[in-house]
């Protein structure tokens, strides 16, 4: 289905207002804490001055001079010529960014991160500006929204989806192992509740939507037309009921058994339909590979090659719960990330506690219409799981810096050491041959 550009813009504006409200609340809390610290500092100064009334020499102004010099250097004004050149380049090219996170793995422990009120604002607070900063943001939901009990049946509370939406997530990949975990009724509920939260499901359709909606999603962002498709290797050994075969996009003809025969015909049919839409960029979200395994199979490489032949520009994988290799071809403008890891999960399995939020840069030449992926980067993230504290997702470099500088509510030494190791492993895995 196509998302109306104005509706898409409206959704993001509403979420921006909600985030601003949350940020104001957080700033008030920080201001109160800061005021307490200032009062303590003043008290300490008074005590020190009272005990030592000797006049101290005035400090030299070297640092201030350096700061002023730096400010002068960084505050250089543009000449009319450079301003015109910048404006001309902006009018010729449109640059947008897509953000993608990995698996949101719904378990009892993950649900409990919201506490008694099932509030997940703090869970995603540290990465919200990254999710919200992109033009389109997506992640994979390994679970459903079919109501209580939460966690034990892979069911997430609606408040978790509301928090994701408020944090900036736009698209939810539902073609995965748990698409029909609670049957077709569960799929229907999940699709409806994703939309209720202001996001759009990708890779699935309800039985009622088979005749009215297409098996892909189109987003128009700043004049760039992007097609999103999603496929899964299977659904935890389950098969779609007769008459519902098109409700979930699958990668294998034998998706409910052995995953040995790539469904070339089915994949081709979907992607040829996408090409008729004439998108500028096509992104495929794939739930594939093997869980807790670093190996990329020959089957995955075959699927990736097939999709690129059929016009896919970016392949973004999930399911292994581990970060895996990334491949970028600047000449062709194509990108493959075999797995982004777990965005949020129990973090009990070594290697699943860290992952990345991917950023893809897409550039469109407004004169020729040529559009391609022109770069990528990622933010290393970590699921902090410490005793007597709820799970939360944090940026690794910033969390480590906070620990080193002794900030309040910092991570533990154990988490710090684990993050240092995670940075090494993420680099090694993403750059693997």
Range-by-range predicted roles:
Residues 2-15, 27-55, 73-433:
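Acidic, metal/ion-coordinating pockets
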Residues 20-27:
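Intrinsically disordered, low-complexity Ser/Pro-rich, charge-biased
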Residues 52-64:
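Ser/Thr/Pro/Gly-rich low-complexity linker/stalk segments immediately outside membranes or between
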Residues 61, 65-73:
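Intrinsically disordered, low-complexity, repeat-rich polar/charged segments
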